Amino acid sequence: MNNSHPTTKSHLFHIVDPSPWPILTSFALLILVAGGVSFMHSYKFNHYILAFGVISVAYCLYSWWRDVIKEGIIDHSHTEPVRHGLRIGMALFILTEIMFFGVFFASFFKSSLSPVGLLDGVWVIKQGVWPPPNIKVFDPFDIPFINTLILLLSGTTVTWAHYALEERNQKDCVTALGLTIILGIFFTCMQAYEYYHAAFKFTDGIYPSNFYLATGFHGAHVIIGTIFLIVCCFRARRGDFAIKNNGHLGFEFAAWYWHFVDVVWLFLFTFVYIFGS
């Protein structure tokens, strides 16, 4: 009897083994959020709660994605209906991310198009003045423009990696992914440098709050996307993507996510940096 894994399943339905990771990831996220709130309010043991939350989320996500990769590469469970369902799931996930950023942009436009004076003395905003007169904003054609060029170039390199993957060119795929990762890390370093030299703090008013929430949330997505691409680069070197019809979803989703990050930054650069200045 041949006990090797078949190349396809005997059916096309999306039936996978029961997994503990969705519910465990939910609890880990709850701990992470609780740790973040505790850290902001300087509660007792806040550092330990936050660290435990970060480690728990990282471990759960690693284990969950490891099992998904095993289902596709070893168990050959990713039939066409399964891949179609996973693509829909990723598209819906990106849609929820768009909603997140939509809220930030709505807050920014509400504050910038109709700035009003607050009487409690917390924020200094004068009627019809944006940015607030006490805020020294960034020059949009300094570091923000460099970051725009970096992300546009990274979008080109990840597309190059995609074409190399389609042509079964492992060397070019790994090279292009490596360049994209370097550009992503460079973007994060430039963003950190910009934050370090900012002339305002998060608590200095409505403008800094909107600025740091929008750009910081995007920066977190760049870091997540970079990690996503690093995993894909290791998998490409290992030859996972050479398995026809089963090993491409991870890279495909990473490319979608990275292009989404690129597009969001173009909106941030246009409205928050140029219009907002």
Curated annotation (Swiss-Prot):
Signal peptide: none annotated. InterPro entries: Cyt_c/ubiquinol_Oxase_su3, Cyt_c_oxase_su3_dom, Cyt_c_oxidase-like_su3, Cyt_c_oxidase_su3-like_sf, Cyt_c_oxidase_su3_a-hlx. It catalyses: 4 Fe(II)-[cytochrome c] + O2 + 8 H(+)(in) = 4 Fe(III)-[cytochrome c] + 2 H2O + 4 H(+)(out). Pfam families: COX3. It comes from the Bacteria. GO terms for biological process: aerobic electron transport chain. It is found in: Cell membrane. It is a multi-pass membrane protein. One of its GO terms (cellular component) is plasma membrane. Its EC number is 7.1.1.9. Keywords: Cell membrane, Membrane, Translocase, Transmembrane, Transmembrane helix. GO terms for molecular function: cytochrome-c oxidase activity. Its main location: membrane. The chain crosses the membrane at residues 20-40, 45-65, 88-108, 173-193, 211-231, 255-275. PANTHER family: CYTOCHROME C OXIDASE SUBUNIT 3, CYTOCHROME C OXIDASE SUBUNIT III. Belongs to the cytochrome c oxidase subunit 3 family. This is Probable cytochrome c oxidase subunit 3.
